[in-house]
Amino acid sequence: MRIVFMGTPRFAELVLEELLQSDHEVVAVVTRPDAIRGRGKKLVSSPVKACAQRFDIPVLEYSSLKSEEAYQALINFHAEVFCVAAYGALLPKRILELPRFGCLNIHGSLLPRWRGAAPIERAVLAGDHETGIGIMRMEEGLDTGDVACTAVVKIEQKTASDLSDELACVGGKCLVSVLDKLDSGTEIHWTKQSNEGITYADKLAKG
């Protein structure tokens, strides 16, 4: 399948690496623009951009996908599905409706618990004993879509960083499994999220 991958941090990079080992074709990557980081105040590329460049994959850098420029750029890649992992911005309705098979999000929690930007960190801070990963069909609501291929991961004594790496690797494999089924026409069991147990994972303040 022709895929446009959207993501920014290391979590997304690990998912992208799993995807690149599959039979599917990543035709472009969308990531947030280079940002000034660290004590040296240097302009640094996102981990996803660096990964894409290693594999000579075209990179689009947008902090938002609301512009006509971004929309037209995505049309030109003729992708069948968009795969999103911690991109860092909401997708407008017309972007969600652009690819034939819609948009899939790799979300680092057992939805509907910890919807939002920082599900892994919030699970650790809350003292949760387990969390997980799921492949969600994206819609306009914040992490409200149907979910497939859920996997549970024990938190134990893991740091948020170690847990994030583990969830990304598991999530990448789940994503490939769902894409394989979409490509072959195999039925996928999508589960609607419960209206109970909803919590929100607000982004953590820096510092």
Where are these regions (language model features)?
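N-terminal glycine-/serine-/threonine-rich beta1-alpha1-beta2 phosphate-ribose binding loop
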Residues: R32, I36-E80
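Alpha-helical oligomerization interface recognition
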Residues: S63-G134, M138, T144
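Active-site-proximal loop/hinge segments within enzyme catalytic domains
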Residues: E140-G207
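Short, structured coil segments at secondary-structure junctions
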Residues: S22, F55, L98-P99
